[in-house]
């Protein structure tokens, strides 16, 4: 028991070796690519892959399957989290460490899973990171400009809950009864001001600010600074007391603001799982910059399950190389940091829905993080 615990701790604290010989229980590493080709969750199978582009990996992710509360009585199910950080990895790491724990606590209080449980978990996580920023502001003020998108899926009792802030995306592959064709259905709402309806929402929330969204270098940005309108963190755009010196000038807004510019409130939807619902693709926007929803669904539908997340990542990288008129083999040689000029960090989790298991109560517990590691808690 003790040796098993030590192995798990070791896997959590240090990345897998680049040789790819690491235990498959925590995934394998191949250069900047980490992958868990195949595993079992409570209601089916899953595949997971992450490729790093930033100097420090800003994408964090997790799959948890088994008890979704602190109670032995449950509820039981599967939790998927994709946390695409920006400005640094601190917020996405914080979310990875705290959101699921908050969800378990609130699910225990209500003895069930619900939209309210998920909303409270987001609120507690946002409040927790605000506490980190408040504490570190005197010595590390730039942490006020670090944030993360946060996409969550919860499968529980035959229901699927999708919650999101930011522009990561969850897509369902559903078989059409008449033809058997598997079509892509986007389940998550995105909060990126490149979308006209999101720009309109920002204008309606801030009618007195004609510069709430600005076109800068041909890209729409909130206050000319950030593309997303909702996030965890980014406290410098939520509380005016963190938008001043000693924060870097590039993050500071000239005119004071009285209400938050960005929101941390998730859009949450409920979906009753149907027999024709075949699989779910959860991914950070690094994937969706390279392929459409239907292209991703077609790839998953037409290839073996084993290694399918890694295949999606590889095809996204091939597309990124093609856009830059270079060979995929040459792209793979580019080091982290420099690689960010060619593509973003990419995280993909594919969850297969075996409907005969969807309403099952218990199963073997699973807990895995993208990259096969966490980091020593410094915040």
UniProtKB/Swiss-Prot annotation:
Its cofactor is Mg(2+); Mn(2+). Residues 42-353 form the PPM-type phosphatase domain. Mn(2+) 1 binds at residues 84-85. The modification Phosphoserine is found at residue 73. Its EC number is 3.1.3.16. Binds 2 magnesium or manganese ions per subunit. Residues 1-20 form the signal peptide. Mn(2+) 2 binds at residues 84, 285, 344. Pfam families: PP2C. Keywords: Hydrolase, Magnesium, Manganese, Metal-binding, Phosphoprotein, Protein phosphatase, Signal. It catalyses: O-phospho-L-seryl-[protein] + H2O = L-seryl-[protein] + phosphate; O-phospho-L-threonyl-[protein] + H2O = L-threonyl-[protein] + phosphate. One of its GO terms (molecular function) is protein serine/threonine phosphatase activity. The keyword Cytoplasm does not apply. May dephosphorylate and repress plasma membrane H(+)-ATPases (PM H(+)-ATPases, e.g. AHA1 and AHA2), thus influencing negatively plant growth and fitness. Interacts with SAUR19. This is Probable protein phosphatase 2C 46. It comes from Arabidopsis thaliana (Mouse-ear cress).
